[in-house]
């Protein structure tokens, strides 16, 4: 019964009724053959072959032959792997016109469907001769129809994307199998295949099938039409249509290619037969062509020309392409797709500006599909892309090789932003110009660019394309929305809510599942496959169980979860089938079988030791034996594709479940849960040569799922310096698929970096062989932990590490789950807090068992270990950990810094050794590649993970020393047995939340902290004295404590911190702590606690100085050197450690004034040395030696490594220098040499050798233009090839690498010391070796703040600013004023911002300085800012205006990119926070919930009004001014009571509102708003009433400012709605900065150019008509050349011309003879004209042939000169000339006739170079000639006789009387000018002259044969114009 086809059924034994039915079916479905079958009863079938009912369960019994049913129960396990696609669709039932939900399963060549997936019997449809097409014309219900010879089904999908996916799957199922290739080429198959794209449609006139040539059935000719070439077919004939759709590339042209002799290709015509439009006219014979009776005549798909069958041979072979020639990419120019996925293009000759079109098929009242089809018809189909299907990247990649092209985005503002973002990604700003066609709702950008508010009609698309071709270019500013999100407090909830705190959990599960799916498809490693399969099952089970638990009443969600389980089971079936036969007995099949056998998979959850609230552990992974087996699995192509389809199916099901779990907030998932649009998995291309020998214990390509993916958090509690994004190593084979999280030592203390993953590194050994090093970052910050929870040191692991003693199980990973939250902060608390809490609890139990002697012994052993640099076994119990250990570590005694094992080698690059050097130390004078990574953007992963740990002895030791080498982040308070633990986050957060980050930065950066230890020198000497040791004893001791303790000692140096001591060493936070402690007697008696601040360097987020590491003192006091030479002699012993922390020394130009503070302290005397640079000199003095002593201990970091006590120790305290500029702004100048000398001088004063040029070579990848020698560059490249410590960064994330909230604590290059005088040339050099910086040249607000908060500032009096010399207010420091002259933000030099390489803008030219603040902001009714109740706020209340209203920004706009922010999105139009964003967010949610209610632009406007009215009542954004802070260019703006803030880049907001208002007043202080001036407009929104009124009223009182950068601080713990270009989301608390990103070329409408082009084209058309011959109705007459013979009509005009010239010559001669006083030159001109006239008719006979036209040129020239001279003479002498009355009249008539005749003449230069004359057979032009602009000559004769003036009448030209005198020929000419030549014969037959023409009516025209309504209207209007003229 298989493969039944209807047209070969045996009907011999059928009844007559059955015979007729079967014969009708055969004729109708003539598409294939059927195997012979005996008597087959056939039910009734429609004529076009469609079934009257496709539901098999209700059809009559005989129809079963067409509905073959098969049982899939027995084949399920064997055949499911070959399923291409499956899912639910709505199926149309023909009987009752209903839709039923059915489950469809698509295999190759077959389609099955049943009621649900669990059915055992499916209906089978053979797809061998399939035709499928789209039924929905207007993209309404996403329906499509599939037709086979036996079946016809109409199916409906839920979305257009799903419908297109099904259509693509049907194409895959029916296409012949081909070898697996590149996914890009597979995606391009549609473009390059030339297949038709059918859709069902109806036609208003008879239409014929292009396949069978029969008429389409029905009154409306219902059938299928190709959306590209308009080929018409029956539904039954679609499968037989050949693939001859519109060409796309040269390969599709095929045999029609025409090559010229020179090798160039010609674009030929592409003809489509029949179905021509009504008004089609033959391009050859100009007669009507086409027919409604049959399929005849031809139409070109490119130039739109139509031609008769007989006339087609006479058509030119070259196709002109049509009216859009400038925009079309000819298929002959596109040769192929190159290796970089771009077209190999050969530009055609002539003008060429290709147009790339992106259409959003959902935009424009769902009319986007119509525009998509229309563009494909007008242009090359390969130029047009649907954004919904392919996105913008595909088109941009194809057009990459075009030097210049245009982009047309047909959509709303959101899609425009999408395309512009992709242009950013491809870096194609200079190649393309972007235009917008308004198809969206708001279309603000299109309004501003001049393209209107909407475009709904596609009929005038050719004319619209011409407008885009004549558009002009303007630059559009684009702004980066940089966000820094803080952790927020989530209120305790009784039950998990998916919409709030569990978003991180959902994201982690989805991400983990996606990773495992990718591993299953791509990996060839069996162990990886096993672990990924188990992890995937566990993750999916956990996800489904948790979602279903909290959505028990949602049946649809339960259905989606069931589908997910079923698809997961099918994936496992496919894996099992794949492994059967080849690996039937291995553990993979057993594992899969065990997973399938589980009926209700449940994951055992138990409390985690890290967080008792949320955690589970997957115990099933422990049961898998990780034995080695085959490294690659041989799969056939079809099996691999089936596995890929299964994985994609599971992936899509997971996305459906997650998206359905919160339907009201889909955007939030996309933006905050990082759920990107679905991307299908692709099968990787593998080569056989890439496989690894089975004997290798570690494969060459490391397994990519050794550890489960980390859980992503919904919002970053803090930006990590190395975010959890992919980092590529120098060797691309290693870190390409491994996510490297930030090491704990480099992460911020408030950051939860997630679960670290495996790190594998490669290093070349001495013998050249490759050694793999595998390291694992533990949750405890680098410590290795065993199963029992005991901590392993490297030495202990080395002793225990054998494969038999310990098995490495990489599969046990703690996974965050959602147990009921006990602590409301637990979901957002950093994981470090959980770690410390856990270790605290663990160690408190073990601490009781330790004895004091044991602790002392361990501490001594640790000191010995550090002194001898030898590994030693710790004598303590192991600490419990989370089973993330480093296997196979073997310590060799020969090298103290190398750990080796049989599998890998680990090199400790930071080990304290004098003998070992890195691999690059053989290069003299060059820093080690391994060690220089620390000062660059790289980190030594292995050294920071596997350095030797020590045995802790107390709870403080355990918490402080979680890592292996004392690298502890110092951004949080120290925790020891002397310090009480700080609850929550760092104190600096509390301070910065009150003061703001800018003030906090000032306080911190001007405070001397103990972090200076590593700032100035690597060897700081004693960082802190150990307990029970004095400072002096420590200085003389060579033994350095292993423990780092930043708290003050109890008995030495700094015994107590009070107002008399020196607490500044511990940072500003400790000042505040000390103040707080003095207020509490209890706290006074307790030892204070201190915290320190992280340091930051350019190009890195957190500097190496932030991690304190013990430095061995290799220099005793007796070998101390006083000069640079001795220092050089001492260098070899310290070369490697010295280069470890050396930073780059740079210079800046003289116009960048950047200084710092230098304090010099001499131990021998109280006088300090003096250092000068240029004109600045600073002398720092100290009063007593007692002050020096505390400073000496606190600022030991500035001591030179070779300078010790006893020789007049010189200390330089360096406040961090300005950050170097980035990019092109950093350029070597002539000042480099002087700066280098300055560096040498400063270094010699400090006793530090000068850095040579090779040591300056590495600093940051962001400053590529620094002066570095080529030799050093080569060394960089050479050594970076094998250095395992270099982790190169993704270029896309390089500029955001330095991301940390503490990064904002740096001193900016442009904020602390703003340049005021360019003559003040202060060089800057900075580094880690006490290079001197020079005193401030300009006062700073931070110094005043320091003086406010803490009077004990360790600054000399000379260093403080002189307040009386400031430019601003001279009032006291505590009085509100523009303190310190920060008026440069409103009246200063705009170009003072370093790093901004800007153009001159109108702002500078008009001397208006930004920011421009609205004066009403200063009014008293705008409330004060300081509302805080903290003690710092109280301290600053008196100075609130000074510190808040006019504060200098602490960070430059360019440098804020480095301050811990990440780019959320890019703004093109506007940014809104508050009520407007709330309305947009509500509208988006409404549209997602009910898309059918938001398909009309008018309805969308209505919804906006409804939601705005809702906000009028609810006021959800009330008191927004209390929740946000606004800064414009660094100036804090006081905010009134408002509900929103809008920042405008374009003068159009939310659908055309000019929210800024019109600036009509001349005295307006603001600049005219523009989108290309790099200026933003800031506006306040007081309510929805104001938003509505702004559409009607010009409001201006709500303006706030114009500026170039904006910062918005979101306070509190609640999310605030934010929108960018209409896309809204909820933004958590934090900071938002809007900075200029780049500029893009936009096409604006140029109406003046359009008018000019239209005028020119009209003149060209008239000119082309004037040179045509008189065309007759026959083709032979048209073949006669116009150059050879003067036509009859031209002869008639010529005779009139001769008569006019003769008459003028006659009367001019008579005038000269009658008035001898007139000049005689005019008489000579008249004689020459007469002679020329005689030459064309010698002896009374006109010349013939081409010579006549040549002779006429001379006649025309001489007669024109005669006419001009006569008019000039009469104008000049007319006032005194008295003419006879008859002479005046005759001369006037002669001149008037001559003027008319000259208008009909034209002279052209022909191809042969000769001039020929042509006569315009038309009536004279109605528009006056250019020479007629002056008054006519007869008016100039007003001084003549009165009688002549009274009797004068102007000649009749273009009046009703003139038209009344027309002959038939002139009427015919008039018709031809209106392009109505088809009625010429009718007018000639009826002898229609001018008199009859003026009286013609509508009925008369109908009698003359003018039946078209449009032609009738045109003729009647032209007659009316003649009558009026």
Swiss-Prot record:
| Sequence ranges of Polar residues compositional bias | 792-802
Keywords in UniProt for this one? ATP-binding, Cytoplasm, Kinase, Metal-binding, Nucleotide-binding, Phosphoprotein, Repeat, Transferase, Zinc, Zinc-finger
Q: Where is this region: Disordered?
A: 620-641, 783-805, 847-872, 1013-1065, 1113-1141, 1167-1234, 1256-1276, 1385-1405
GO CC annotations on file? cytoplasm; plasma membrane
Q: Where is the composition biased (Basic and acidic residues)?
A: 863-872, 1115-1128, 1386-1405
Query: Catalyses which reaction?
Result: a 1,2-diacyl-sn-glycerol + ATP = a 1,2-diacyl-sn-glycero-3-phosphate + ADP + H(+)
| Highest rank taxon of the organism | Eukaryota
Extent of Low complexity compositional bias: 1167-1187
- In this chain the DAGKc domain maps to 350-486
Function as written in the Swiss-Prot or TrEMBL entry: Phosphorylates diacylglycerol (DAG) to generate phosphatidic acid (PA).
The protein, known as: Diacylglycerol kinase eta
- Organism listed in the record: Drosophila mojavensis (Fruit fly)
């Amino acid at each position: 019964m298989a493969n039944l086809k209807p047209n070969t059924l045996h009907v011999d034994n059928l009844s007559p009724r059955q015979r007729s039915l079967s014969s009708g079916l055969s004729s109708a479905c003539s598409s294939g053959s059927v195997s012979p079958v005996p008597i087959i009863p056939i039910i009734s079938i429609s004529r076009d072959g469609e079934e009257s009912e496709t539901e098999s369960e209700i059809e009559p019994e005989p129809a079963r032959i067409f509905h073959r049913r098969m049982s899939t129960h027995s084949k399920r396990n064997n055949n499911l792997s070959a399923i291409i696609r499956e899912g639910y669709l709505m199926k149309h039932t023909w009987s009752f016109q209903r839709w039923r939900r059915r489950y469809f399963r698509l295999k190759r060549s077959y389609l099955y469907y049943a009621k649900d997936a669990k059915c055992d019997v499916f209906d089978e449809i053979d797809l061998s001769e399939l035709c499928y097409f789209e039924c929905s014309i207007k993209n309404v219900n996403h329906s499509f129809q599939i037709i086979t010879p036996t079946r016809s089904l109409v199916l409906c999908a839920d979305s257009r994307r799903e419908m297109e996916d099904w259509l693509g799957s049907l194409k895959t199922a029916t296409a012949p199998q081909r070898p697996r290739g590149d996914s890009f080429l597979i995606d391009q198959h549609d473009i390059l295949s030339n297949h038709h794209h059918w859709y069902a449609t109806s036609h208003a006139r008879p239409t014929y099938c292009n396949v069978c040539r029969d008429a389409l059935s029905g009154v409306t000719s219902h059938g299928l039409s190709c959306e590209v070439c308009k080929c018409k077919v029956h539904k039954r004939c679609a499968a037989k249509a050949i693939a001859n759709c519109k060409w796309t590339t040269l390969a599709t042209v095929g045999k029609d290619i025409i090559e010229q002799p020179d090798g160039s290709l010609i674009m030929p015509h592409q003809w489509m037969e029949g179905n021509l439009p009504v008004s089609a006219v033959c391009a050859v014979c100009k007669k009507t062509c086409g027919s409604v009776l049959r399929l005849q005549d031809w139409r070109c798909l490119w130039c739109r020309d139509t031609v008769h069958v007989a006339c087609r041979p006479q058509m030119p072979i070259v196709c002109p392409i049509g009216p859009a020639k400038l925009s079309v990419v000819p298929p002959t120019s596109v040769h192929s797709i190159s290796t970089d996925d771009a077209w190999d293009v050969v530009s055609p000759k002539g003008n060429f500006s290709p147009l790339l079109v992106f259409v959003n098929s959902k935009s424009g009242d769902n009319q986007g599909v119509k525009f998509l089809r229309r563009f494909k018809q007008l242009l090359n189909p390969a130029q047009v892309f649907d954004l919904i299907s392919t996105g913008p990247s595909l088109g941009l990649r194809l057009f990459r090789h075009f030097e210049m092209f245009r982009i047309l985005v047909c959509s709303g503002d959101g899609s425009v932003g999408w395309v512009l973002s992709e242009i950013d990604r491809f870096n194609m700003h200079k190649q393309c110009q972007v235009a917008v066609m308004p198809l969206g709702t708001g279309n603000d950008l299109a309004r501003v660019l001049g393209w209107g508010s909407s475009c709904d009609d596609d009929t005038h698309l050719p004319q619209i394309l011409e407008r885009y071709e004549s558009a002009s270019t303007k630059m559009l500013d684009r702004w980066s929305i940089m966000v820094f999100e803080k952790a927020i407090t989530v209120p305790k909830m009784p039950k998990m809510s998916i919409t709030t705190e569990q978003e991180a959990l959902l994201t982690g599960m989805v991400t983990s599942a996606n990773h495992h799916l990718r591993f299953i498809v791509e990996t060839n490693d069996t162990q990886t496959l096993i672990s990924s399969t188990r992890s995937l099952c566990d993750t999916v089970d956990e996800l489904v169980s948790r979602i279903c638990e909290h959505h028990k009443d949602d049946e649809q969600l339960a259905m989606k979860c069931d589908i997910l389980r079923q698809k997961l089971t099918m994936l496992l079936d496919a894996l099992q089938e794949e492994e059967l036969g080849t690996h039937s007995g291995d553990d993979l099949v057993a594992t899969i079988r065990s997973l399938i056998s589980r009926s209700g998979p449940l994951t055992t959850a138990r409390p985690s030791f890290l967080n008792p609230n949320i955690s589970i552990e997957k115990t099933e992974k422990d049961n898998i034996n990780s034995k080695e087996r085959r490294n690659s699995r041989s799969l056939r192509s079809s099996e691999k594709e089936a596995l890929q389809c299964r994985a994609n199916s599971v992936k899509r099901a997971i996305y459906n479940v997650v998206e359905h779990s919160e339907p009201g907030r889909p955007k939030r998932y996309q933006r905050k849960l990082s759920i990107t649009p679905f991307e299908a998995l692709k099968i990787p291309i593998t080569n056989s040569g890439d496989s690894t020998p089975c004997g290798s214990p570690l494969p060459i390509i490391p397994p990519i799922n050794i550890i489960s993916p980390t859980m992503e958090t919904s919002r970053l509690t803090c930006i990590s310096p190395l975010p959890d994004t992919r980092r590529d190593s120098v060797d691309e084979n290693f870190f390409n698929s491994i996510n490297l999280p930030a090491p704990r030592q480099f992460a911020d203390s408030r950051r939860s970096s997630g679960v670290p993953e495996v790190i594998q590194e490669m290093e070349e050994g001495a013998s050249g062989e490759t050694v793999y090093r595998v390291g694992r970052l533990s949750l405890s910050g680098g410590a290795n932990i065993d199963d029992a929870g005991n901590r392993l040191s490297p030495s202990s692991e080395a002793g225990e590490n054998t494969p038999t003693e310990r098995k490495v199980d990489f599969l046990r990973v703690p996974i965050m789950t959602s147990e009921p939250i006990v602590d409301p902060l637990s979901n957002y608390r950093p994981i470090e807090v959980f770690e410390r809490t856990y270790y605290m609890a663990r160690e408190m139990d073990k601490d009781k068992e330790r004895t004091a002697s044991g602790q002392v012994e361990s501490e001594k052993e640790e000191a010995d270990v550090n002194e001898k640099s030898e590994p030693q076994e710790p004598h303590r119990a192991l600490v419990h950990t989370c089973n993330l250990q480093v296997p196979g570590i073997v310590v060799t005694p020969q090298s103290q810094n190398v750990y080796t094992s049989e599998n890998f080698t680990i090199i400790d690059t930071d080990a304290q050794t004098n003998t070992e050097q890195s691999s690059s130390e053989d290069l003299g004078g060059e820093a080690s590649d391994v060690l220089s990574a620390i000062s660059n953007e790289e980190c030594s992963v292995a050294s920071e993970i596997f350095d030797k740990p020590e045995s802790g002895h107390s709870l403080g030791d355990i918490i402080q020393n979680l890592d292996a080498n004392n690298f502890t982040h110092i951004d949080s308070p120290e925790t020891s047995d002397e310090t009480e633990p700080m609850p929550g986050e760092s104190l600096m957060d509390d301070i910065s939340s009150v003061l703001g980050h800018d003030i906090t930065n000032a306080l911190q950066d001007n405070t001397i902290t103990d972090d200076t230890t590593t700032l100035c020198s690597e060897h700081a000497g004693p960082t802190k004295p150990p307990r029970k040791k004095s400072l002096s004893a420590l200085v003389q001791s060579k033994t350095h404590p292993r423990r780092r303790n930043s708290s003050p000692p109890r008995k030495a140096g700094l015994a107590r911190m009070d107002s008399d001591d020196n607490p500044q060493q511990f940072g500003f936070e400790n000042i505040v702590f000390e103040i707080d402690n003095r207020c509490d007697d209890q706290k006074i008696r307790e030892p204070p606690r201190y915290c320190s601040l992280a340091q930051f360097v350019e190009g890195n987020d957190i500097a190496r100085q932030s991690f304190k590491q013990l430095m061995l003192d290799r220099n005793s006091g007796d070998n101390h050197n006083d000069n640079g030479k001795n220092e050089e002699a001492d260098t070899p012993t310290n070369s490697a450690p010295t280069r470890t922390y050396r930073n780059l020394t740079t210079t800046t130009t003289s116009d960048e004034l950047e200084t710092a503070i230098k304090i010099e302290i001499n131990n021998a005397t109280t006088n300090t040395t003096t250092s000068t640079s240029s004109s600045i000199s600073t002398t720092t003095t100290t009063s007593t030696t007692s002050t020096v002593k505390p400073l000496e201990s606190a600022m030991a970091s500035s001591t030179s490594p070779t300078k010790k006590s006893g020789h007049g120790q010189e200390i330089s305290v360096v406040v961090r220098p300005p950050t170097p500029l980035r990019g092109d702004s950093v350029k070597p100048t002539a000042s480099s040499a002087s700066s280098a000398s300055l560096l040498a001088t400063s270094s010699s004063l400090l006793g530090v050798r000068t850095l040579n040029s090779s040591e300056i070579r590495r600093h940051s990848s962001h400053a590529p233009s620094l002066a570095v020698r080529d030799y050093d560059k080569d060394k960089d490249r050479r050594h970076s090839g094998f250095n395992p410590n270099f982790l190169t960064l993704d270029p896309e994330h390089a500029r955001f690498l330095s991301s940390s909230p503490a990064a904002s604590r740096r001193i900016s290059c442009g904020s602390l010391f703003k340049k005021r005088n360019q003559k003040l040339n202060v060089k800057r050099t900075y580094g880690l070796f006490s290079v001197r910086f020079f005193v401030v040249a300009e006062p700073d607000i931070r110094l005043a703040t320091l003086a406010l908060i803490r009077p004990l500032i360790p600054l000399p009096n000379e260093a403080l600013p002189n307040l009386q010399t400031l430019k601003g207010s001279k009032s006291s420091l505590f009085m509100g004023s523009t303190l310190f002259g920060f008026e440069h933000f409103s009246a200063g030099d705009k170009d003072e911002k370093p790093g901004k390489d800007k153009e001159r803008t109108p702002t500078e030219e008009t001397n208006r300085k930004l920011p421009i603040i609205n004066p009403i902001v200063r009014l008293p009714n705008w409330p004060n800012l300081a509302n805080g109740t903290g003690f710092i706020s109280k301290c600053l209340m008196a100075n609130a205006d000074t510190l808040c209203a006019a504060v200098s920004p602490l960070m430059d706009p360019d440098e804020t990119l480095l301050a811990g922010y990440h780019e959320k999105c890019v703004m093109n139009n506007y940014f809104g926070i508050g009520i407007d964003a709330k309305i947009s967010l509500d509208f988006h949610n409404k549209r997602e919930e009910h898309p059918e209610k938001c398909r009309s632009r008018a309805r969308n406007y209505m919804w906006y009004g409804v939601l705005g009215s809702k906000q009028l009542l609810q006021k959800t954004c009330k008191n927004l001014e209390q929740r946000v802070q606004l800064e414009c260019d660094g100036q804090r703006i006081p905010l009134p009571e408002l509900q929103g803030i809008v920042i405008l880049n374009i003068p159009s907001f939310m659908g055309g509102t000019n929210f800024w208002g019109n600036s009509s007043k001349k005295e307006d202080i603001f600049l005219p708003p523009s989108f290309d001036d790099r200026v933003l407009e800031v506006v306040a929104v007081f309510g929805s009433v104001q938003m509505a009124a702004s559409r009607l009223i010009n409001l201006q009182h709500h303006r706030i400012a114009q500026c170039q950068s904006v910062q918005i601080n979101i306070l509190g713990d609640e999310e605030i709605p934010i929108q960018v270009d209409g896309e809204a989301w909820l933004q958590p608390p934090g900071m938002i900065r809007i900075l200029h990103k780049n500029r893009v070329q936009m096409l604006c409408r140029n109406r003046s150019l359009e008018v000019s082009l239209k005028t020119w084209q009209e003149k060209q058309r008239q000119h082309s008509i004037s040179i045509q011959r008189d065309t007759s109705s026959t083709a032979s007459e048209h073949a006669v050349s116009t150059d050879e013979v003067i036509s009859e009509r031209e002869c008639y005009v010529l005779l009139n011309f001769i008569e006019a010239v003769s008459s003028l010559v006659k009367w001019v001669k008579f005038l000269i003879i009658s008035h001898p006083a007139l000049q005689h030159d005019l008489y000579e001109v008249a004689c020459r004209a007469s002679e020329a006239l005689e030459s064309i008719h010698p002896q009374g006979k006109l010349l013939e042939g081409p010579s006549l036209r040549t002779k006429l040129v001379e006649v025309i020239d001489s007669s024109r000169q005669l006419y001009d001279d006569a008019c000039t003479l009469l104008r000049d002498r007319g006032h005194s000339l008295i003419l006879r009355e008859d002479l005046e009249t005759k001369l006037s008539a002669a001149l008037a006739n001559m003027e008319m005749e000259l208008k009909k003449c034209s002279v052209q230069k022909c191809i042969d170079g000769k001039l020929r004359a042509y006569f315009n057979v038309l009536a004279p032009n109605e528009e006056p000639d250019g020479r007629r602009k002056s008054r006519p000559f007869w008016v100039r004769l007003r001084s003549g006789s009165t009688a002549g003036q009274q009797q004068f009448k102007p000649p009749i030209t273009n009046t009703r009387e003139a038209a009344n005198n027309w002959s038939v020929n002139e009427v015919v000419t008039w018709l031809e000018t209106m392009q109505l030549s088809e009625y010429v014969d009718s007018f000639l037959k009826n002898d229609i002259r001018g008199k009859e023409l003026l009286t013609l009516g509508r009925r008369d025209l109908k009698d003359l044969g003018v039946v078209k309504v449009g032609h009738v209207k045109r003729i009647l209007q032209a007659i009316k114009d003649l009558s009026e003229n």
